């Protein structure tokens, strides 16, 4: 798991290593509690992006914290930088609209080890096409699926790539 959520962490079961990013301080504390006592878990209080930098986050949105004009300065890094050549088997990302930038920042990982991907495709209307086209351009061996989940509220539409 990478860029993990509570459910991803809780349901991981048999894993070699979990690496999770969470830029929001309050959510990061919750993540630490959920992972307490788990082996081989690395938690990073930062966001994922196309480059290593600092961005402004609106943390007032709680679970939906996102890049904004006003807010808190937050460190972000590429997945490739954090993994530093380590293989990844599965990457789940719900990065509130920074999905395309996160994919750019993990290009080497997608090329070298083709991890299974689970990315949100509903934050920006163009993401349904843009994300799939980019993933295919980086590694045409991916099979790409789109699934809409019947949750309430009903906006969870994800790309699954295997």
Predicted regions and their residues:
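Short, conserved active-site loop motifs that form the nucleotide-linked donor/cofactor pocket
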Residues: 41-42
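Conserved SAM/SAH-binding beta-strand->alpha-helix loop
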Residues: 24, 49
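Short internal loop-to-helix segment that lines adenine-nucleotide cofactor pockets
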Residues: 51-56, 61-113, 137
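Conserved SAM-binding loop
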Residues: 31-32
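Single conserved hydrophobic/aromatic residue that forms the stacking wall/gate
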Residues: 1-4, 8-9
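Conserved SAM-binding motif I beta-strand of class I
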Residues: 17-22
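A short, conserved beta-to-alpha structural element at the edge of catalytic cores
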Residues: 114-130
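Binuclear metal-ion centers of metallo-dependent hydrolases, dominated by the metallo-beta-lactamase
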Residues: 128-162
């Amino acid at each position: 798991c990478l860029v993990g959520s509570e459910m991803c962490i809780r349901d991981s079961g048999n894993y070699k290593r979990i690496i999770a990013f969470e830029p929001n301080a309050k959510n990061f504390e919750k993540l630490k509690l959920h992972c307490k006592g788990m082996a081989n878990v690395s938690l990073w209080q930062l966001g994922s992006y196309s480059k290593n930098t600092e961005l402004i986050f609106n943390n007032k949105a709680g679970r939906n914290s996102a890049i904004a004009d006003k807010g808190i300065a937050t460190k972000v890094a590429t997945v490739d930088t954090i993994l530093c050549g380590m293989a990844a088997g599965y990457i789940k990302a719900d990065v509130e609209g920074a999905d395309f930038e996160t994919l750019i920042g993990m290009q080497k990982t997608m090329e070298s080890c083709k991890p299974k991907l689970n990315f949100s495709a509903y934050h920006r209307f163009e993401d349904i096409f843009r994300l799939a086209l980019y993933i295919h351009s980086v590694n045409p061996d991916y099979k790409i699926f789109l699934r809409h989940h019947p949750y309430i509220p009903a906006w969870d539409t994800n790309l699954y790539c295997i």
